[in-house]
Design a protein with these regions (language model features):
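Catalytic center-proximal scaffold of phosphoryl-transfer enzymes
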Residues: 1-218
Length: 218
């Protein structure tokens, strides 16, 4: 099992949760949300990279409460760009134009219009039918977790989970994945917990009193 990192943001505060294994991380997330009362009169929004195992955990652990899952915009845009690069042909300007058109459609979260656009690509512009169909399947699968990214962006709301990736780098990756270092699950988890406690401004409390405050930090 690997370290799982969850980053919570509410109002102007934040908190980093880490655990060995996704199930344990989600249990700690629920404990944190209950302790801080962040599930009271609030809308829960999960920004993810679209991984099925993450979505399954969210649906399982939060089945008791209304929530929203949003696919990370950067991940969606990159994935579609890669598929389009393999699926279409033409001059650079023509290919870039098709990619921009698809991106602008998905920016507003309209999966049905995106599929209609892809279906309308002329045969002479198709390089690989299989990749084009895979792109359509991908968009259809992800349609339940697409949103109007343009509106969220305009309102100053989050459209990407890149902050989680940054926290993962700070808590896990930068300390454990370089210099050919090898870690046991126990050692890796312990180091990640210490790093997270430091990020949460509760390292002294954790080391001296063996206590975690479970409070948002600035």
């Amino acid at each position: 099992m690997e370290n799982t990192v969850i980053h919570v943001q509410a109002d102007k505060g934040q908190y980093t949760i880490t655990a060995i294994g996704m199930d344990q991380a989600f249990r700690r997330l629920i404990a944190f949300l209950l302790e801080t009362r962040l599930m009271e009169d609030r809308r829960l929004i999960f920004l993810t990279d679209g991984a099925v195992n993450i979505r399954d955990r969210i649906e399982r652990f939060f089945a008791f409460r209304e929530h929203t899952i949003i696919l990370d915009w950067l991940h969606l845009d990159k994935k579609c760009y890669e598929y389009m690069s393999m699926a279409v042909k033409g001059t650079k300007a023509e290919k870039d134009g098709m990619k921009r058109t698809l991106s602008s459609i998905l920016w507003t979260g309209r999966a049905d219009k995106a599929i209609k656009f892809l279906n309308g690509i002329k045969k002479k512009s198709i390089k690989n039918d299989r990749k084009l169909n895979e792109l359509k399947d991908y968009i259809l699968r992800k349609s339940p977790v697409l949103t109007c990214y343009a509106l969220r962006h305009e309102l100053g709301l989050k459209i990407s989970s890149n902050r989680v990736e940054k926290e993962n780098d700070l808590v896990v990756a930068s300390r454990q994945k370089h210099n050919g270092m090898s870690w046991s699950d126990k050692g890796s988890g312990a180091l990640a917990i210490i790093a997270a406690a430091s990020r949460n401004n509760e390292l002294d409390s954790f080391l001296v009193n063996k206590q975690i405050r479970f409070r948002l930090c600035a």
